């Protein structure tokens, strides 16, 4: 297992405060959202995996925002389809 240094990850993000926010969002996605890791897990915790993904350039704030927007649009489309189906059956 390769060690992740905060400095390497900070260089990808810009500052350590944004790094904490991005890593926490990504770790939460893996922990509670059922999202798969983009790097081999190697028995690491979600926070370490998130830092490794950031360090490798696989996860950025823009990537997280785009994924969340897409998921929200898909959820809204499913809800609209369900409402339309209910209204159509009446």
Curated annotation (Swiss-Prot):
It holds the Pfam family RNA_pol_Rpb6. Its EC number is 2.7.7.6. SMART domains: RNA_pol_Rpb6. Gene3D superfamilies: 3.90.940.10. One of its GO terms (molecular function) is DNA-directed RNA polymerase activity. Keywords: DNA-directed RNA polymerase, Nucleotidyltransferase, Transcription, Transferase. GO terms for biological process: DNA-templated transcription. It catalyses: RNA(n) + a ribonucleoside 5'-triphosphate = RNA(n+1) + diphosphate. It is an enzyme of class 2 (transferase). The keyword Ribonucleoprotein does not apply. The keyword Nucleotidyltransferase applies. InterPro entries: DNA-dir_RNA_pol_omega (IPR003716), Pol_omega/Rpo6/RPB6 (IPR006110), RPB6/omega-like_sf (IPR036161). Residues 69-90 are annotated as: Disordered. One of its GO terms (cellular component) is DNA-directed RNA polymerase complex. PANTHER family: DNA-DIRECTED RNA POLYMERASE SUBUNIT OMEGA. Promotes RNA polymerase assembly. Latches the N- and C-terminal regions of the beta' subunit thereby facilitating its interaction with the beta and alpha subunits. Belongs to the RNA polymerase subunit omega family. The RNAP catalytic core consists of 2 alpha, 1 beta, 1 beta' and 1 omega subunit. When a sigma factor is associated with the core the holoenzyme is formed, which can initiate transcription. This is DNA-directed RNA polymerase subunit omega. It comes from Vibrio parahaemolyticus serotype O3:K6 (strain RIMD 2210633).
